[in-house]
Amino acid sequence: RTTFYNNIKIKGIEETEAREINGLPEEAQLSNFNWSPDESKMAFTNTIENGVQVYILDLETATAKRVTEAFVNANMGNPISWFKDGKSLLVNMLPATRKELINTAEAVPTGPTISTSDGSKAQNRTYQDLLQNPNDVFNFEQLATSALVKVNLDGTSTLWKDAAMYSDVSFSPDGKYIMTSTIHKPFS
């Protein structure tokens, strides 16, 4: 579950007043805050009606700038990692090959509903957030799959690693290596 913030301000240790940030989106839903390695900038996401965007906040000028369209995949943890040089980000983006999700309320069942002899549904154990049928598996795959894209501070981007179900992306302390963890079938 994600906590969203509708505004941020900055205040230096020696400053008495917090400064307003220029360039924040209207009706902001901000999350996934991430400091640059030199701590002069901060990357964060803004969730809008049709997706998630990445913004960069320059702390010296107190100005935020959007650097991606609403194609960020923030479904599996923090979608933003800074490269060691602080000049670019590694961002989990929706792949171009992403398919439409199956509407499970309208989908035709793939098998029978198990019921007791009196016609009521059989009592089964209930667990939260489990994949219960092939439609759930398909939807999970679509929601969890990201392409890793290198996004520069000016908003230009290049594909860094092809689409997979990345559960974690982390840089080594010296910034020379990146470890990615992926999820593979079968899921349980």
Annotate the PLM regions:
Residues R1-N7, L94-V149, H184-S188:
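Predominantly five- to eight-bladed beta-propeller fold
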